[in-house]
Amino acid sequence: MKRAIAAALVLGAAFSASPAFAQVKQTRDEILFYTADWTGERFPDGRPMVADSLLKRAVNVPIEDVWEYVRERGYRNQFESGWQALHPEKPFAGRALTAQYMPTRADMEKAIKAEGKAEGRTGGTNMWPIAELQTGDVYVADGFGKIVEGTLVGSNLGNAVAARSQTGFVFDGGIRDQEENRQIPNFNGFYRGYDPSAWADMHLTAINAPIRIGRAVVVPGDLVLCKPEGVLFVPALLAEEAIGAAEMTQLTDAFNFELNRSGRNKAEFEGGWTAAKYDAFVKWIEANPDKLKMPRAEFDRLLAERRKKE
C-alpha cells in the first residue's frame, strides 16, 4: 500500500510539474494524430497541403461524383446543404482551416483570453483564426448555427479573410455587412443567414480541431468544395483520387451523352461498356484533348482500372 501511495504521489508530482498545453490552437502533433494516413506535404501547423492544381480542378466537377467516391470509402458524413452564399453562382474550393465557437461561459472565456494574451494574440477571439489563414485556405467555422449576434465576419473581417486566404469561408453561423462583403474581389462565402447585429455572447474554443458543420465532420486540411448544391468536405488523403474519379465520370458521361444524341448507343443509354466502346472513347478523347483536365498518365491509369472492372 505504501509503495502504491508513493508511486501515486510521484506520478501526481510529475503531472503537476509538467507545463500546461495550449487549449485553443491544436498542436502540430494533434493534427498529425487525426491525419496520420496523409503522406504528402504539410503546412508548418501540420495540416495536409492538398495541391493547388487539385483545388482548381475540383471546382469543375459535379459534387455528386466526388461525394459518391468518398461515401463508397466509408466517409458518410461529409456533405451539408441549406446555405446562403455571397455569390451562389461561383463555386470555390480550398483547404480547411477550422474554428469552433460556443456560447459565452465566463470562466472559459477568461482562460482562453489569458492564453491568447500569453501567446501575443490581439483583438477579439473571432480574429484569431483569421490570423492563421494561408493562401488557398477556406475558413470553416462551427458557430453552432447562431445568426442573430452570431455574425462571425462583417466587412472589416471579411476583407481580412479575403486578403489572407484569397478564397472564402464556410460558417455554420451568420454574417453582417453582406452587401459590402459581396463587393470584395475574388471572395466568396457560405453561411446560414444575414443579420445586422454584431457578434456577441459567444467566444472561440478551438482552432484547427475536428469540428461538426451540420451533419458533416471536418478535419483541418480537408479539401472544401463549395457549390450551389452545398458543401462537401473531402478528406485530404482521398482528394486526388476522388477528383480524378469524378473527372473520369464526367468524361465517360459526356461521351455517352454524345452517343445517345446521335443514336449510336441504340438501346444502351447507360452502360454497355464493351472493349470496342472503350476504344472509341479513347479516340474521342484524342480528338477532343481540351476535355481532359487531368494529366494524360492519370487518365490512362484510371481507364485501365475501369476496364478491368467491366
Please place each PLM-identified region on the residue numbering.
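Bacterial N-terminal signal peptides
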Residues: 6-16
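Channel- or pocket-lining gating/hinge segments that regulate access to a cavity or pore
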Residues: 229-232
